């Protein structure tokens, strides 16, 4: 027999799959972005970075569409904690979509015209932006990387708090409100 109440407290399998696929891709992408050489010796890594970035953009748009068409489980926390969780989740969506878009803007405004070929197979167009925006696009892309890193740390810390609440409730024999951790797929 299916426990409908428990099922309503969990994210769907699709949401969980998108969450962890994007999380792993973001971790890889941030590590790659911070470690890539800034000269022509990193050409292959830049191509990989662009393909991973486009993939993150497409997956994030799919995740946003999923979120808009599938009801998430009820919020675990209220008050300031609930506000903070909602703010971090919203900003993570801005990051997951904004970061690839600013990267696309960097490539599109670069004085070095190198075509982008998605995973070496699909030509990817450049945005019709003036080259004068390149410096601002690069600075914004780098700033978003640091902001995204901070948001990820806040998100993981929030999950730690939620799991702690759930474990505390379980050890005391009480029920955690709304299932404190449904394996994070917000």
Question: What does each of the following model-derived ranges do?
Answer:
Residues 1-186:
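Membrane-embedded alpha-helical bundles that constitute the cytochrome b-like, heme-associated redox core
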